[in-house]
């Protein structure tokens, strides 16, 4: 949606009209074919893309991913400056999902020129967003600068972004934030309580994740009986469990596998 100036959605299709001023960081136009190439690559079973299943609402996507149909059968095509997506089934959440990075376009000629180096380093990537990666020390740091060809560049008020510390350790991130080495830190379950007790300002946001309790269905187990599972489920207080047992700020109980934003 960020590259489109408008879109129309019906139960059977989605049509995106691309911005005429959408550009890659090399100055060339972002075209509908860039999305077709990218999406076909993602659904290719040989690629084994981890988010390929997010495309399954698209016509033939699941069968293509299983190898039952050729990649060209995927229900996506370019017509001029429009990207047309045919749906296998009505999809109320598809517009939100298509903002995920897995659906980003790829310029085919650039991809082919990089061969197997595509995406391996900053110089082997092409960008159509507000910033370009200029330095990437894997697992340590990265730097970005403003993309001079971005269609809304006048609204971007930062010239550079420097991420001086990259770590998967939640405790390290919190300590770096406390030492004013970083401006924002994403917290984990083991650090969010400490941050709250310290009086730090916390912001919560939907993570796209869900936790649940599962039953052991092995033969001979009491929980293999559906009536036992129903009895436990009917007496389980999710509000009590989340708010008093887990007791992590930002966690919410839910009664459905579907997130609240699904229409």
Regions found by a protein language model. Name each.
Residues 1-5, 28, 94-104, 214-216, ...:
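A structural "hinge/loop" feature
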Residues 5, 12, 33-41, 96, ...:
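Solvent-exposed, polar/charged alpha-helical surfaces in well-ordered, non-transmembrane soluble domains
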Residues 5-54, 79, 84, 173-176, ...:
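Aromatic- and charge-enriched surface segment that lines or borders ligand/interaction sites
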Residues 8-25, 98, 206-220, 259:
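Periplasmic solute-binding protein
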Residues 23, 40-48, 90-92, 99, ...:
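Sec-exported extracytoplasmic/periplasmic mature domains
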Residues 61, 67, 72, 80, ...:
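Gly/Pro-rich hinge or "lid" segments in bacterial periplasmic/extracellular proteins
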Residues 119-125, 148-195, 230:
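Ligand-site clamp/hinge motif
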Residues 155, 186-263:
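Local pocket/hinge segments that shape ligand/substrate recognition
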């Amino acid at each position: 949606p960020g590259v489109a100036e408008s879109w129309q959605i019906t139960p059977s299709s989605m049509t995106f009209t691309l911005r005429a001023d959408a550009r890659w960081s090399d100055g060339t136009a972002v075209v509908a074919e860039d999305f077709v190439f990218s999406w076909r690559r993602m659904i290719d079973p040989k690629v084994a893309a981890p988010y390929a299943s997010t495309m399954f609402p698209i016509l033939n996507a699941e069968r293509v991913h299983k190898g039952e149909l050729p990649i060209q059968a995927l229900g996506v095509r370019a017509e001029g400056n429009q990207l047309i997506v045919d749906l296998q089934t009505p999809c109320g959440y598809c517009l939100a999902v298509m903002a995920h990075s897995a659906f980003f376009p790829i310029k085919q000629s650039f991809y082919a020129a990089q061969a197997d180096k595509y995406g391996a380093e900053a110089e082997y990537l092409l960008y159509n967003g507000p910033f370009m990666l200029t330095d990437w020390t894997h697992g340590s740091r990265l730097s970005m600068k403003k993309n001079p060809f971005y269609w809304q560049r006048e609204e971007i008020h930062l010239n550079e972004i420097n991420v001086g510390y990259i770590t998967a350790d939640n405790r390290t991130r919190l300590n770096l934030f406390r030492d004013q080495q970083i401006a924002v830190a994403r917290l984990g379950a083991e650090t969010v309580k400490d941050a709250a007790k310290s009086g730090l300002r916390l912001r919560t946001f939907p993570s796209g994740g869900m936790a649940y309790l599962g039953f052991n269905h092995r033969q001979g187990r009491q929980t293999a009986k559906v009536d036992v599972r129903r009895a436990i489920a009917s007496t389980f207080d999710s509000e009590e469990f989340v708010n008093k047992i887990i007791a992590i700020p930002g966690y919410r109980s839910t009664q459905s596998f579907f997130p609240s934003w699904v229409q």
